Amino acid sequence: RKECEEEYAFVKNYLQKLNIPLVYYEIDSYEKGKFTESEARQIRYQKFLEVCHEYHANILLTAHHADDLTETILMRLLRGSSLKGYAGIKQVSFYEDVTLLRPLLTRNKKEIYGYLKKQNIPFVHDKSNDSNDYIRNRIRHEILPLLERENPYYYQKFLSFSELLQEKTNLIDEEISKVKKDVLVNNKIDILRFKNYSKAMQNAFCEDYLYQIYQENITKLTKKHLNIFMNLLLGKKENAYYEFPMDYLFIKNEGYAFLKKKETIKPFCYSLEDYLVLDDK
């Protein structure tokens, strides 16, 4: 965006006054429409990770607030997700070896703006948030005002909803860990043992299995993918193959099943030193 240079100059000047170092990166391929929100997020967090390693930092604070959490939950409810996905953004999470903290998650944007104005702290407005081209912005502009009219503290309800789901998923995770010890053999799913569990536990196990593989990219998967994964495991076919997003291949063979990254063959050149030409006449 053309406004990026102005925003960068603003942040640079402000931090210089406070004697706080600034790390700034431009990502050339980060163009509108080229990446989904999830892919763009992955690019940003990978860069954050590199900076943390460069400065030997193991904690990263982000500015996510309560409205971000509400928007994320609503987006996932509309698109479909897992129980963990519906919980939205966590106050504490982990990205590889870095701990992510979100200290503003209990405050909404209006409260943050109020604090900035009261303390005479300058800020800039991100104009890309004004467009309704993205579903997150449409939720922000059209749905959140309706929720605020019904309950000015709607965001606190979404925060409580998120925390409740996280508590429940933690309990489920404890049970899943027991199932994994029984069902996983050399990181492969023993289908006969898998079938011994209730449908609810099978579903929870599959959600966890896919999450452990996709991690931050779990939003690439929908409820449809989970159902396909379940049906392949429980189906009568002894041998089955299916391609999942991001080049993961489901393989079912000889009573076991697993996901693996598709192997890509890199282009190569081989020079023939001795050869024979056959005349087909």
Task: Cite the ranges covered by each PLM segment.
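Solvent-exposed amphipathic alpha-helical surface segments
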Residues: 18, 55, 150, 213-217, ...
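Contiguous mid-protein beta-loop-alpha structural module that forms a pocket-lining wall or clamp
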Residues: 96, 101-200, 204-208
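Mid-to-C-terminal catalytic/tRNA-binding core of tRNA(Ile)-lysidine synthase
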Residues: 188-280
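Hydrophobic/aromatic-lined pockets within catalytic cores
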Residues: 78-79, 148, 210-214
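Core alpha/beta nucleotide-donor-binding catalytic domains of modification enzymes
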Residues: 1-145
